[in-house]
Amino acid sequence: MKIYFIVGLLFMAMVAIMAAPVEDEFEPLEHFENEERADRHRRVTCDLLSFKGQVNDSACAANCLSLGKAGGHCEKGVCICRKTSFKDLWDKRFG
């Protein structure tokens, strides 16, 4: 039983050593020469997620809530978030 425990520890130590990152690997990744702006696709929640009209505005509203807005709706396939934040709406109703 002791031999299995020792072999297991040696195996785990070998795996940990092999999985450790090498410092030289990260040097080229840290220097970005030319950063490009990422494209924003506002139609994903309204077009792709509302397949055959099953999700509709709820995916857009959930996306807007995750952005800190008070909800949203789909308008011609584009997700339109409310201007007010969720905190402002909460304070207006309950605060």
UniProtKB/Swiss-Prot annotation:
Keyword Ligase: no
Disulphide-bridged cysteine pairs: 46-74, 60-79, 64-81
Name of a matching Pfam family: Defensin_2
Listed SUPFAM superfamilies: Scorpion toxin-like
Expression by tissue: High expression in head, hypopharyngeal gland, and mandibular gland. Low expression in thorax and thoracic salivary gland.
The species this protein was found in: Apis mellifera (Honeybee)
Name of the protein described by the UniProt record: Defensin-1
Gene Ontology biological process terms, A to Z: defense response to bacterium; humoral immune response; innate immune response
Family stated for the protein in its record: Belongs to the invertebrate defensin family. Type 1 subfamily.
Gene Ontology CC entries for this record: extracellular space
Function of the protein: Found in royal jelly and in hemolymph, potent antibacterial protein against Gram-positive bacteria at low concentration.
